[in-house]
């Protein structure tokens, strides 16, 4: 199963299903299928989700793609991404990973936990 570490601040929205996408830059590729999120600093805290789609596009289009352009204007989006990727630029290509919530993932007929 694919595994992805997440900073503690972002873990609760994944667990509750509020966060159903993540944006990555210059990291190992994620593919559709099962993904285990692991909370950085607390490896026992995990959430399993089903990745439904992975899309490459410029960072400048990412907020609109995940329907969060109101919450993430350019300055906020860049500042947030630069917390994790200090060298990222507005036109760099990112991978957007979209997934079901953990609760929706549990309902899949092939889920084995």
Give the location of each predicted region.
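Structured alpha/beta reader/binder surfaces that contact nucleic acids or chromatin modification marks
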Residues: 1-113
